[in-house]
Each structure stands twice: as structure tokens, then as C-alpha cells.
């Protein structure tokens, strides 16, 4: 009998992903309650969502907060004070950092949280956790909340109109769910059934992304709202979040995310989104594990999707030893999840993996 206690939080209480999804707000909240809502959003996000917002957004009494900070203790305290008393619900409109902040604010105020993602770069709208930062914007830790998000409202047309780099990053980050989960749970038959369900979901999502992403990206380029596009969006927002919710620590992060963290020490990589760097990290993980078949499959897919297959595409020179040494040192820190890999890790083995990826031909 397995003795691996885990906490399962499959997902939000309500998830709607279709044109007109915002109207569901009125199915769960009265006008009186929505007149006491706190809306928090970023400048670009609210501009992108403006034409789709429900009438509730303009109700007298609703609080509107334009947010430009981080999910930091001081910013959340300030937002709580600005929200005022007698509020009914927190509604966050934006990307991952904004939604993390709004989630934390909702818990601070003891209110239900409604997520309105305007990009599909992460599963932040789905997951009941926030990444905390200091006031300088440096990541500190993440907090898993005691309750699920109340509602997620995905309006596909808003995401269709977003810059394509965000969808690409979401594809990269969500592909990692499968490739990292199989490292974290090499013997799933010994683990709780929910972990196995999470792994099965990760595999299904991987297949959707490998089979449909090229078409979805083309459809976005042509401004066509299609089944392929909606499937990829749901795979990122709902599927990615569900995997972690079912499997807990057995379906979260391994080497791909550690490589991402290592790359962040180089300032030139800051311009690249989280999921874009994670996608590259999957290639390095595959090289470390000697999985040439996976490396070939993903390199071919990335070239079709326009995800990076080399450090050069992330503006990092493989021959700059000082920079590569910094990346390796950070990636191999004792706290990093790369150490879940069932292989011996040294600076030399990691350097060899980077070089293998750099010269690999699909």
C-alpha cells in the first residue's frame, strides 16, 4: 500500500472557456454583490479585454485598481487598504503576475477569486497558488492556498488577439508537465491513483500540444478562432493546472525549470518569457537523460513552432565560459529541482548537455 500523502486540489470551482464566458459572472453574483467587487488589472490587460467586459464592470460602487507592481507583501497590503471594506469578490484581469497578486489579495480579504486571463502563457488562472516577490521584483517563494479559486473565465478572442509570444511560452511551459512528471514519478504504480491520473493527463496534454500547436499558432496569426486554437489554450490554462492539482509534488518541476532558473542569472535572457526558457530546459533535461529520441522529436517540433532549440536563440554564447559557468552554478544549486534526475550531476555533465543540445540536428 502506498504511503505518499498528497493534497489534491483538482481545479477551480467553476471554469468557463468560450465566447461570451464573462456573462457567467451574473449567474453566480447578483448586481448588488458585483457593485461591491474589486477589479484589479494591468494597463495592457484591461485594454485588451475592454470590448468583452460584462456590464458588471461599470456598476456604481465597484472598485477599480490599475496595478503596476509585484506580488509582494507591501503591494498586497497596499491593495487591501485601497480595496476598502464590505467587498464581495476580487476579479483579476491579466497575465500570471497580475493574477498571482489578485489571488493573494482575495485570500487576504477573505473573498472569492475570479480569474480573467488575457494571455495563455501559464496556468496561473487555474492554480490556487501565488509566487511572492520582494519589492525589487526578485522571486522569493510560492504559497499554496487553502482553497481553490472560485471561477475562471476564459474569453478565447482576447487570447487570440494577444501577442503570439505568450501562447508560445504557454506551449513550452505546459509541455514540461509531462517531461518533468515522468522524472518525478518513475514508478507511478507505487503512488496514489490521483498521481497516475495527473501523469495520464500530462501525457494527453503533451499529445494535444505536439499535434495541434502548429495549427493553433497559424490560426492565431490569421486571427481565426478554431478548435485547435481553443484546445491549445485550454491545454495550457486548464490542463497544465490540473496536472499539478492531481499529482501535487509528483507532477511539478524537475530539470527543465532548474535550467530556466539558471538562465535567469544572465541579464540578456530577461526579455524571454518563462515558458520559452522552460521549453529550452526540456531539451537539456533530455540530453542529461540520454533521451536522443525525445530530443529529436522536440527539436523538430520546436523548429516548427519557433521555440528555441539552442542557447544562441536565447542570446547566450555557448563558448562564453564565464557566462555558462554562472548558469551551471545556479542550475546545480542544492535547492534546485534538477537533482530529482536519476543521474550523476556535475558541472561537466551539465556543460556537456548544453553542448549536445547546441549541436543537435533533428
Swiss-Prot record:
Domain of life: Bacteria
EC id: 1.1.1.-
Cofactor(s) annotated in UniProt: Zn(2+)
InterPro entries according to UniProt: ADH_Fe/GldA, ADH_Fe_CS, Glycerol_DH
Any matching Pfam family: Fe-ADH
Cofactor remark: Binds 1 zinc ion per subunit.
Residues that bind Zn(2+): 173, 257, 274
Known function: Catalyzes the NADPH-dependent reduction of 2-oxoglutarate and 2-oxobutanoate, leading to the respective 2-hydroxycarboxylate. Cannot use NADH instead of NADPH as a redox partner. Do not catalyze the reverse reactions.
Protein name, entry field: Hydroxycarboxylate dehydrogenase A
Organism: Escherichia coli (strain K12)
